[in-house]
From Swiss-Prot:
Signal peptide: none annotated. Its EC number is 3.6.4.6. It catalyses: ATP + H2O = ADP + phosphate + H(+). It holds the Pfam family AAA. It is found in: Cytoplasm. Binds 1 Mg(2+) ion per subunit. It comes from Arabidopsis thaliana (Mouse-ear cress). Belongs to the AAA ATPase family. It comes from the Eukaryota. The keyword Hydrolase applies. Required for vesicle-mediated transport. Catalyzes the fusion of transport vesicles within the Golgi cisternae. Is also required for transport from the endoplasmic reticulum to the Golgi stack. Seems to function as a fusion protein required for the delivery of cargo proteins to all compartments of the Golgi stack independent of vesicle origin. Required for maintaining the normal morphology of the Golgi apparatus. This is Vesicle-fusing ATPase.
Amino acid sequence: MAGRYGSQVMTMTVTNTPSADLAFTNLAYCSSSDLRQFSVPGSDLFLANVADSFILSLCGHGSIRDGNIALNAIQRRHARVSTGDMVSVSRFVPPENFDLAMLTLELEFVKKGTKSEQVDAALLSTQLKRKYTNQVLTVGQKATFEYHGTNYILTVNRADVEGQDHTNGIERGLLSKDTYIVFEASNASGIKIVNQREAASSNIFKHKEFNLESLGIGGLGAEFADIFRRAFASRVFPPHVTSRLGIKHVKGMLLFGPPGTGKTLMARQIGKMLNGKDPKIVNGPEVLSKFVGETEKNVRDLFADAEQDQRTLGDASELHVIIFDEIDAICKSRGSTRDGTGVHDSIVNQLLTKIDGVEALNNVLLIGMTNRKDLLDEALLRPGRLEVQVEISLPDEAGRLQILQIHTNKMKENSFLGTDINLQELAARTKNYSGAELEGVVKSATSYALNRQLSMDDLTKPVEEENIKITMEDFLHAIYEVQPAFGASTDDLERCRLNGMVDCGHRHNHIYKRAMLLVEQVKVSTRSPLVTCLLEGPSGSGKTALAATIGIDSDFPYVKIVSAETMIGLSESTKCAHIVKVFEDAYKSPMSIIILDDIERLLEFIAIGPRFSNIISQTLMVLLKRLPPKGKKLLVFGTTSEVTFLESVGISDCFSVTHSVPTLQKEDAKKVLNQLNLFSEDDVDSAAEALNDMPIKKIYMLIEMAAQGENGGSAEAIYAGREKININHFYDCLGDFIRFTG
């Protein structure tokens, strides 16, 4: 709401105000003849836009010569002019409905020192309106004001005109007798505002609004809004409001989630945004001491400053923020640590006493961070303690885009980003990447661009900065190089199908299609957050390769394979913990696939006896039936060659669907041999006949043996297509193969 300006812009000479007392009026002064040019039609107001910075009310003064305008020191500083300078001045005509509905002013002393004052907001508002009514005030403008013998500087922090859209221009308005004025003062100013009602007092924060991207926080808008509502909304209001509501401030919050998602960053930025004491940042293990009682004293010392302020200042005390990184290191469940000292139990007791004890502090905000919430003592998580618990999870695609924009912002500003960069595509490609991993991708991409400008033969060669360009190809290389901790284990899955996938006939194709329907069901259904499928069949029939192919083709962000080969030599309890961790990690991803390969091997099954691990069996049965958290979806595939055993122990009943993966019949084997093209056309039928009812894995092994030739050295020519496998040698290999494997 800019108003209208006079058609004529004057250039006037800046002078001092005629007398010291006029400096406190916030008026500008000029000659009587010049004053007429700034008259607002239909009123007795004289308004001028000075240097396109702010609007001042003018008054005529006999000592001011024509062509001069008198400004006080504060006004000259705001207009960035000195006495004797020329400044542009034009008439300002306010638009309709220009009266201020609400005005927020920050108070500070003109002479800063150790003096402290208590200011009555109601009396100051009355005095201010008496002197400043019908003046136009602009956000950012400063004015000097004398109140009860003390000189103050007023800074306009907010100017709200009813119905005005702040996005359309500068925030300003006309002070009227109906304007509601809110006064603010920083804790360091020495000014205490009393008798102020009905309006929020936002001096708890250093800034009046938050731009999370400028703080380096991306993809956490919803989480930050939740934190603000629950932990800070009550602190924004004056103490008497919360007192009348009968509520207590939140004293603690817990940020938990996977590593690298921004928990520490958010806690640090929250600490920086708050007015008051600098936050105390404590890494969990730093509190511990080898001396008896010293650890508990270290905890008490963290709260010492807050206790002192509470005693001396009461409700006016500054907020003290204490940030505990890796809080699970010192606040484990009481009784879980068997070190004989009980020091971890004492730490929990000491924290509970300080936060929520008999003499609990009301000026403390404790922020804890952990990726192992399950290790914390339950008493810490109850209301009154770390009651606000916010999960900082892996960012979604929109969040990843914000994070990439933050980390590439400087590159873009300095023209280092190539024109082919598509951040939206990169965000789509980086599923389940944490914020830290996305930063790693940007660093890796930058390293490729920088490396192109270096010569290994002469590292002292000057670098031409304008040639540094980070391209889309650099980012694609970086994505391949930096793998997410909670992503799909593509390399592990590819190792499960080293020979690729061939068409094994309609029976295998049917199983693949039915399994992909389960994938689609998990993706779109709101009623099936957990789907489980068991692939059973003879050893070597391709169950693991089929499951791995489904995992790769599913395009799920998290695909993990659990096999006995990664747990060789581990105890039963350690194996259980490993399996549980894989499931817990899967719950952190929106959609996940877990492949339990060779379940009988995981259970340490031996047919003689029989023997198996009951602990692992019970763990699997619980996990296969446990629903993932709300909003998360999980698909579990299991493979086994001992389905009868799994039926006897009840594990097969935990799977919703069971598919039998068969051996290859003659027609299937012929189809495979035709695709491999290693036999002559005349020999394919004979070879397929011999391979009837054989698993695909054994077929591959047999063909590998036959491809070596009778005297060895034939494999290269055969795979290159220059020669074919000799059918007689193939039969010889088949006889040996059956004798040794059958």
